[in-house]
Amino acid sequence: MSYLNNPAVVMDNGTGLTKLGFAGNDSPSWVFPTAIATAAPSNTKKSSGVGAPSAVSNEASYFGNSTSATNFNGATGGLLSNNLSGKRGTEDLDFYIGNEALVASQGPSYSLSYPIRHGQVENWDHMERFWENSIFKYLRTEPEDHFFLLTEPPLNPPENREQVAEIFFESFNCAGLYIAVQAVLALAASWTSSKVTDRSLTGTVIDSGDGVTHVIPVAEGYVIGSAIKNIPIAGRDITLFIQSLLRERGEADTSLRTAEKIKQEYCYVCPDIVKEFNKFDKDPSKFAQFVVENQEKTRRKVVDIGYERFLAPEIFFNPEIASSDFLTPLPTVVDQTIQACPIDVRKGLYNNIVLSGGSTMFKDFGRRLQRDLKSIVNNRIAQSELLSGTKSTGVDVSVISHRKQRNAVWFGGSLLAQTAEFKGYCHTKKDYEEYGPEIVRNFSLFNMV
């Protein structure tokens, strides 16, 4: 029963990125795209390695990781001998995941797909392969020696949980499994913020990744499902918006990769879009240039960066500038979400609005959200006071930004999975064999508060 002493494995599979690691660590050991490249039917028996990512591999998320890719064999897609992936035969599997999948798909032998769309698994066969490579090749561990904490989006269908259980207990033979709602884990991660004085599992989580933005109210660790709202604006939409602006200007490089780099390195949220336009018009130094080099560094392209620096993340607050399909600003959606909750929990939901995910990392994102949301709340209170003739005590609106924000869900899972009681809340292989996959429809809540 060595699994009782081994750290739990924490896996956060998002639409855009997957984060892998062990409980108790401050950051995931591996972060790479949730992508898989599978061999085309006519290329299932490749001999020359054409299209294989021989030079580029998934990289560890921190220096000195023992699972670095230095032993990667580009011709086979596996690790060299004398390791778990060799033991399990993953070096013979004709597919790649993560960054290696992106490279392999550039050749004629492989096709690229993303098994998760808008937070939900769409292709379970590809997802199982993705997990298999994640466990044996990157984490280099035996599932029967570890408990696993996996994350899920809000309102995930129970049938999806059962599918996960079947894969992890039957295909991987894992010791135990816990499936946690991402919003609850994000709340736990926010405890690292200096603004948080009470380790509460009550709050409103704004989780914005690559594919979708969720606004999720949580009361004492339980998600208020009827009030959840989804916003069809996230990181990928911002990248595409930047790309469209670059194309309109006829820039030298308008690739998605360049747009993504500009988003990550140059974009910020401004307090007033009209004033920001005026600042740029008066001060040319606010414009920037981005240099794009090819892989051999023999060609250079210069891309001018202008208004998209503040226009791109502005679509959260003025979505009409990018699309006519969705017109409700994020602060309004947050207010509507909280107002749809029971009145006795609203104060706590306004007072603890937690940001999670890479698309909330723009400079001054939290400050702008707090200002706009506070304005909405104050206007409602003023109108209520006018109609009732009474004086309100007001509502404290607080948006929490913290240093673990980018990997908040994974870090929250790491915090909770390292507790002494975690394994007691997991469902084990024995439970699965006795009760079947429906046992994972419910998990007991952590007594963390």
Curated annotation (Swiss-Prot):
Gene (name only): ARP3
Species: Saccharomyces cerevisiae (strain ATCC 204508 / S288c) (Baker's yeast)
Gene Ontology CC annotations of this record: actin cortical patch; actin cytoskeleton; Arp2/3 protein complex; plasma membrane
Family: Belongs to the actin family. ARP3 subfamily.
One of the record's GO molecular function terms: actin binding
Subunit comment: Component of the Arp2/3 complex composed of ARP2, ARP3, ARC40/p41-ARC, ARC35/p34-ARC, ARC18/p21-ARC, ARC19/p20-ARC and ARC16/p16-ARC.
One GO term (biological process): actin cortical patch organization
Function as written in the Swiss-Prot or TrEMBL entry: Functions as ATP-binding component of the Arp2/3 complex which is involved in regulation of actin polymerization and together with an activating nucleation-promoting factor (NPF) mediates the formation of branched actin networks. Seems to contact the pointed end of the daughter actin filament.
Keyword RNA-binding attached: no
Keywords noted in UniProt: Actin-binding, ATP-binding, Cytoplasm, Cytoskeleton, Nucleotide-binding
Transport listed as a keyword: no
Subcellular location: Cytoplasm, Cytoskeleton, Actin patch
Further comment: Present with 6650 molecules/cell in log phase SD medium.
Name under which the protein is recorded: Actin-related protein 3
